[in-house]
Amino acid sequence: MAKRGPKTVGVSYRLGLTPGVFMESLVKVADNSGATLAKVIGVPHYKAVWRRIPGAAVGDIVIVSIRAGKPELRKQVMRAIVIRQRRPYRRPDGSWIAFEDNAVVIITPEGEPKGTEIRGPLAKEAAERWPKLSAMASIIV
C-alpha cells in the first residue's frame, strides 16, 4: 500500500531533470584533481524497474572509475557530481539547455570538491544544489 503523509525526511524537492549520463558513460573530469577521463559505474540511491539502466542528471552524484589522468589516480573508484550533460533538458522558464560534453567534478567521501577550480561552464542547477562548486566556477550557465 502507498505511504501517506510527507515525503522522506532529508530529501529536498528537486525538479525532474532529464537524465543525460548513464551507466558505462565516459565523462570528462572538469576540475584540476589530476583525473581527465572517468567512466560512470553507479548512481547512488537510484530506484527503478528491473533492467532499466540507471541515469543521472545535472547536479546528481555518480560513482566513477578514473580511466585517464595521473598514474596514482587511475583505476580508483570515486564519487563525482555531474556538472554538464549533452542531453537537452528543460528549465522552469521554458528554455532548453544542452552542453557540448558530459562532465563531472570529483568529490571526497565527505562531499567536498577534490580540485580547486572548474574548467568550462557549470550548470545553474548544479551551482544551486552545491554552493561550493559555484565558488570554484568561472562561468555559470
From Swiss-Prot:
Signal peptide: none annotated. Binds to 23S rRNA. Forms part of two intersubunit bridges in the 70S ribosome. GO terms for biological process: translation. The lineage of its organism: Archaea, Thermoproteota, Thermoprotei, Thermofilales, Thermofilaceae. Gene3D superfamilies: Ribosomal protein L14 (2.40.150.20). It comes from Thermofilum pendens (strain DSM 2475 / Hrk 5). GO terms for cellular component: cytosolic large ribosomal subunit. Pfam families: Ribosomal_L14 (PF00238). Belongs to the universal ribosomal protein uL14 family. Keywords: Ribonucleoprotein, Ribosomal protein, RNA-binding, rRNA-binding. InterPro entries: Ribosomal_uL14 (IPR000218), Ribosomal_uL14_arc (IPR019971), Ribosomal_uL14_CS (IPR019972), Ribosomal_uL14_sf (IPR036853). The keyword Ribosomal protein applies. Part of the 50S ribosomal subunit. Forms a cluster with proteins L3 and L24e, part of which may contact the 16S rRNA in 2 intersubunit bridges. It comes from the Archaea. PROSITE patterns: RIBOSOMAL_L14. Transmembrane segments: none annotated. GO terms for molecular function: large ribosomal subunit rRNA binding; structural constituent of ribosome. This is Large ribosomal subunit protein uL14. The keyword Ion transport does not apply.
